[in-house]
Amino acid sequence: MLKLRKVAITGGLSCGKSSVCRILKELGAYAVSADEIVHHLLSSDVNVSQKVVDLLGKSILKNNQIHRSLLAERVFQNYRLLTGLEKILHPAVYGEIEQQYQKQQDSKNQFPFFIAEVPLLYESDGAKFFDTIISVVADPEISLQRFKTHTHKSEKEFQSRMARQISPLEKAIRADYVVLNNGTLSELQQSLRELYQELKIYI
């Protein structure tokens, strides 16, 4: 059986990682999202959720469930708590990604390759788990506008979050492929159709 290529999609804030992941999935790849895995872990994994509550306290609970906005408020201005949270979540996320990958690898392998959207790939030392890295980049002004439109948060919040990440330029330098996402959706789709065909060639 041929090895299923494992691809990570990463990049800066509001650069279009989810759009790239969605388009490649529509073209035929198997896709998972670290953010969706985190949501599942916090809502359904008793072991992980209890560790998070032990770290952050019951103030992050609403109706006895972890509320993500309350969690965010608790950690994003506290480096110690944020680091502690990441130490809980990152191994659990990579464990779930690997489980899903092995399930596809052990099946009839109907997908041409496996992709995982991992925003903090380099920050969490996760590049070693993947065969290929794609970094999505966009001009800072475009990313800022997308961030403000989608989250209704301020430029200050955007800059604060960006400051906690490796720069988009550094992520692009480290990656195997770079996808520029400054234009229209149709332009992005066209560039990804070409990349998709290249990624399928893997032995």
Curated annotation (Swiss-Prot):
Protein EC: 2.7.1.24
Superkingdom of origin organism: Bacteria
GO terms under biological process: coenzyme A biosynthetic process
Reactions that this protein is recorded to catalyse: 3'-dephospho-CoA + ATP = ADP + CoA + H(+)
Keywords associated with the record: ATP-binding, Coenzyme A biosynthesis, Cytoplasm, Kinase, Nucleotide-binding, Transferase
Pathway: Cofactor biosynthesis; coenzyme A biosynthesis; CoA from (R)-pantothenate: step 5/5
Limits of the DPCK domain: 6-203
Physiological role: Catalyzes the phosphorylation of the 3'-hydroxyl group of dephosphocoenzyme A to form coenzyme A.
Protein family per UniProt: Belongs to the CoaE family.
The protein, known as: Dephospho-CoA kinase
